[in-house]
Curated annotation (Swiss-Prot):
GO terms for molecular function: actin binding; calcidiol binding; vitamin D binding; vitamin transmembrane transporter activity. Disulfide bonds join C29-C75, C74-C83, C96-C112, C111-C122, C145-C190, C189-C198, C220-C266, C265-C273, C286-C300, C299-C311, C335-C376, C375-C384, C407-C453, C452-C462. It is found in: Secreted. This is Vitamin D-binding protein. Glycans are attached at N288. It comes from Rattus norvegicus.
């Protein structure tokens, strides 16, 4: 599928399929004609699976069936000029029925209170939160071929749904490219005289594309959750924690560069955006940090740019530096033209001194700095800072201490050892707890730690979990 085809269909489906405007209809009809029904349907399945990842296969399949059917009917030669508008209106009405077979969304009921085009636009804007914990598990070669031989089309549909709903934050061209290559591999190897050898060879050839797709899904998911400014802060925190001996001038350009890449590539319909941009970023990583840190130097000996990127991405935090405590930025720092520079400097200095996961630091720093910046809009900013700074400092300190307590021992131990130490700490803290109560607390705390105490923890899930744990501190 050529880049322009993906571009046009993505735009048409993402923003306009339900609108019924002539120019949008023409785009979709052009794609149906160019791609053919089967590829058009496959691309529709990918798009709706990534848009509604919490839905069932049956719900997404039913929606795709309706969309393909109305597109075929309304794009046929001699079709009624009002066909597209009529059929999309019927689809939006059907979506509002209590037993509608389509993806379920909490916003549907509100959309159904609207009429006509307004309802269609409301429906078109609905989407689920992306999956932050991909659960797709590839079957064995034998299981793949058994399912493929039994029902090739059914296997392909199920795979497109499962993979696209789990890795839907990867740029669309990467998702299309990988899934198409995967299904081609299955078709070739399951009809081969030596399927095991075939799968081994094909997977080796697809390895870099697979890594690029899954890693792009990771970083784009984080970017989608944070937005551009918080992503920039997040990358700065991570780099400062990984290389606390570096200078701000070494790490800030890297944080900004990666943020700019994600802003360009995550929603790009260019086939090679990530493949072109990430290798250039790894050169900058090695140029800035390989001489500052032995682990980054080791990463830069990896044989491929993707290897370097993955090595640096998954690198754990280093021991924080033992440096004098730093003061919060003042009104002079935050209310002048150099406010961004002051916030970057404070974020960097706090991060290199602090051993608490990035999701904690990003959350509390965002709240702290935002509250102080609001003082700049008051009549007496100096007085506001004098009042707010001590409060923010106490909240910041309490938050970090609580985060360190929640994640204590996690990064330095295997999961089994961590759970043992956690049980010992909880037993000491609550000596009267029954074995069942203790087991429940260990399970709850260890589940939280496994998801939110690493350097690349998913922001959406962990933010809500941290809110629940830190409510008293955040509301103080």
């Amino acid at each position: 599928m050529k880049r322009v085809l993906v571009l046009l269909l993505a735009l048409a489906f993402g923003h306009a399929l339900e609108r019924g405007r002539d120019y949008e209809k023409d785009k979709v009809c052009q794609e149906l004609s160019t791609l053919g029904k089967d590829d058009f349907r496959s691309l529709s399945l990918i798009l709706y699976s990534r848009k509604f990842p919490s839905s069932t296969f049956e719900q997404v399949s039913q929606l795709v069936k309706e969309v393909v059917s109305l597109t075929e009917e309304c794009c046929a030669e001699g079709a009624d000029p009002n066909c597209y508008d009529t059929r999309t209106s019927e689809l939006s009405i059907k979506s509002c029925e209590s037993d509608a077979p389509f993806p379920v969304h909490p916003g549907t009921s509100e959309c159904c209170t609207k009429e006509g085009l307004e309802r269609k636009l409301c429906m078109a804007a609905l989407s689920h939160q992306p999956q932050e914990f991909p659960a797709y598990v590839e079957p064995t070669n034998d299981e793949i071929c058994e399912a493929f031989r039994k029902d090739p089309k059914g296997f392909a549909d199920q795979f497109l749904f499962e993979y696209s709903s789990n890795y839907g934050q990867a740029p669309l061209p990467l998702l299309v490219g990988y899934t198409k290559s995967y299904l081609s591999m299955v078709g070739s190897c399951c009809t081969s005289a030596k399927p095991t050898v075939c799968f081994l060879k094909e997977r080796l050839q697809m390895k870099q594309l697979l890594l690029l797709t899954t890693m792009s899904n990771r970083v784009c998911s984080q970017y989608a959750a944070y937005g551009k400014e918080k992503s920039r802060m997040s990358h700065l925190i991570k780099l400062a924690q990984k290389v606390p001996t570096a200078n701000l001038e070494d790490v800030l350009p890297l944080a900004e560069d990666l943020t700019e890449i994600l802003s360009r590539c995550c929603k790009s319909t260019s086939e090679d955006c990530m493949a072109r941009e990430l290798p250039e970023h790894t050169l900058k990583i090695c140029g800035n940090l390989s001489k500052k840190n032995s682990k980054f130097e080791e990463c830069c000996y990896e044989t491929t740019p993707m290897g370097i990127f993955m090595c640096s991405y998954f690198m754990p935090t280093a021991e924080p530096l033992q440096l004098p405590a730093i003061k919060l930025p003042t009104s002079k720092d935050l209310c002048g033209q150099s406010a961004t520079q002051a916030m970057d400097q404070y974020t960097f200095e706090l991060s290199r001194r602090t051993q608490v996961p990035e999701v904690f630091l990003s959350k509390v720093l965002d709240t702290t700095l935002k509250t102080l910046r609001e003082c700049c809009d008051t009549q007496d900013s100096v007085s506001c800072f004098s009042t707010q700074s001590p409060l923010m400092k106490r909240q910041l300190t309490s938050f970090i201490e609580k985060g360190q307590e929640m994640c204590a021992d996690y990064s330095e131990n295997t999961f089994t050892e961590y759970k043992k130490k956690l049980a010992e700490r909880l037993r000491t803290k609550m000596p009267n707890a029954s074995p069942e109560e203790l087991a429940d607390m260990v399970a709850k705390h260890s589940d939280f730690a496994s998801k939110c105490c690493s350097i690349n923890s998913p922001p959406r899930y962990c933010s809500s979990q941290i809110d629940a744990e830190m409510r008293d501190i955040l509301q103080s």
